[in-house]
């Protein structure tokens, strides 16, 4: 009964802030199957592959590329500008951590995928779409932001931070919904976009031009550490941000946990210029492997450790405590568990070998929400100032925040063809076979204001790890 009442309250709150009174992963089996249809969002892509994957990431010996036999006689692919740079760097160094390779491929200031490539999201020429491109999604997140503002006591200034804002579509949708439902809040908002890519920033500026002011209502930052404000209420949102952060991969061998690295591949019978190998020595990063995995390794075991993601969580924690009142919403595809071998390359809505064409292929991994939560649980300061909530599926989060109410009021005024498009987008967000189950939502906030809907039950804290000492 209490859960039923809680859900009714959250849906009613969502209806209120949405203004509806007026119209308005992959399987871990490691097998790959040929299929004629490809899902277009990145989690959906992991459900199917058009050809045999170039990486046998669940092999028990090495996490080394297993090249498709159809390419075995091909010459090496043409080297991209970033490929040349990486070959020189790795040749001089001998080997390169996989996490650093992924970071360079995505964020190299001149040749990185997100720094240089345009049309990577949303369009027909894009490599994938995200939920941000579907208006329903932004409307519901706007409702969540408005509820957070109300729970904080309707402060006269509210900072809204989006990490990895893509094309600016999600922020534009949220601001339009806030403008419609609560224009006073729009006046109080200060917008901050954390974006590393120069080309992407220009795209975001065009998308959000109508909301920019002479005083600079919208500002851009290279990273979270650069955000200047403190002691003012803040809401953080990250949609499909953590999946693009580099992860370290480890395999358990006779030497214990050994990091997966990249070395130059000069074999003329393989297409890529790189391959994955074991590091010749131990890694300092191995201490970041959570205890429940680190102490129970068996030969052949593989685990991904979201080292950058956990560092980002610590930065978020510090920023939120500095803001006194703050809430954060993380949405991504992943599981509330450890992830193993999930590195994937995506180009043109298809899987490709993640070691091919550096800088021209999107690289991502499924997110371990368990590790992100562990990054907070192990810190006494986080336990003292923050509270976090059980991970929800995207389906449940959107449902609890009133997406069905939104659907009913939008679709009744649409023509048949437009209504079918609306329903198609709704199903993409909600169906378990699409984004509804593979995408998860993790929320946390400071302890000094009521829980933001629909998060009612705080997650119980496990014992503080003894070895951490912090």
List each language-model region with its residue ranges:
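Conserved protein kinase catalytic core
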Residues: 201, 245-246, 338
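Rossmann-like AdoMet
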Residues: 2-4, 9, 17, 37-234, ...
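A short SAM/SAH-binding and catalytic strip from SAM-dependent methyltransferases
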Residues: 231-254, 303, 307, 311, ...
């Amino acid at each position: 009964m209490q859960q039923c009442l809680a859900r009714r309250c959250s849906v009613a709150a969502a209806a209120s802030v949405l203004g509806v009174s007026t119209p308005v992963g992959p399987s871990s089996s490691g097998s790959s199957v040929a299929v004629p249809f490809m899902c277009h969002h990145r989690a959906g892509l992991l459900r199917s592959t058009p050809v045999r994957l170039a990486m046998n990431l669940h092999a028990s010996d090495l996490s080394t590329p297993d090249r498709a036999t159809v390419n075995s006689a091909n010459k090496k692919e043409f080297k991209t500008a970033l490929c040349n740079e990486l070959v020189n760097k790795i040749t001089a160094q001998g080997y390169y951590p996989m996490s650093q390779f992924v970071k360079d491929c995505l964020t190299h200031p001149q040749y990185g995928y997100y720094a240089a490539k345009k049309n990577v999201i949303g369009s027909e020429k894009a490599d994938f779409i995200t939920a941000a491109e579907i208006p329903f999604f932004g409307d519901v997140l706007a409702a969540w932001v408005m509820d957070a503002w109300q729970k904080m006591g309707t402060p006269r200034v509210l900072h809204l931070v989006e990490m990895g804002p893509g094309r600016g579509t999600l922020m534009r949708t949220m601001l339009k919904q806030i403008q419609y439902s609560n224009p006073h809040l729009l006046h109080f908002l200060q917008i901050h976009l954390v974006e590393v890519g120069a080309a992407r920033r220009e795209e975001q500026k065009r998308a959000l031009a109508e909301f920019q002011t002479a005083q600079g209502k919208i500002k851009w930052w290279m990273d979270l550490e650069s955000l200047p404000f403190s002691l003012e209420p803040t809401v953080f949102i990250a949609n499909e941000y953590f999946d693009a952060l580099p992860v370290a991969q480890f395999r358990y061998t006779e030497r214990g946990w050994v990091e997966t690295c990249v070395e130059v591949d000069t074999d003329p019978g393989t297409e890529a210029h790189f391959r994955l190998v074991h590091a010749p020595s131990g890694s300092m990063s191995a201490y970041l492997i959570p205890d429940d995995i680190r102490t129970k390794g068996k030969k052949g075991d593989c685990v991904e450790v979201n080292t950058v993601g956990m560092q980002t969580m610590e930065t978020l924690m510090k920023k939120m405590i500095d803001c006194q009142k703050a809430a954060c919403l993380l949405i991504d595809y992943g599981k509330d568990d450890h992830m193993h071998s999930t590195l994937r390359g995506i180009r043109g809505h298809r899987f490709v070998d993640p070691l091919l064409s550096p800088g021209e292929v999107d690289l991502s991994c499924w997110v371990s929400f368990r590790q992100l939560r562990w990054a907070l649980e192990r810190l006494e300061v986080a336990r003292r100032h923050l509270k976090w909530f059980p991970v929800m599926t995207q389906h449940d989060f959107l449902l609890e925040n009133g997406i069905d109410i939104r659907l009913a009021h939008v679709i009744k005024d649409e023509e048949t063809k437009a209504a079918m498009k609306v329903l198609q987008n709704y199903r993409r967000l909600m169906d378990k076979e699409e984004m509804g189950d593979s995408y998860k939502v993790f929320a946390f906030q400071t302890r000094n204001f009521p829980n933001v809907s629909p998060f009612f039950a705080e997650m119980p804290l496990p014992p503080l790890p003894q070895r951490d000492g912090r």
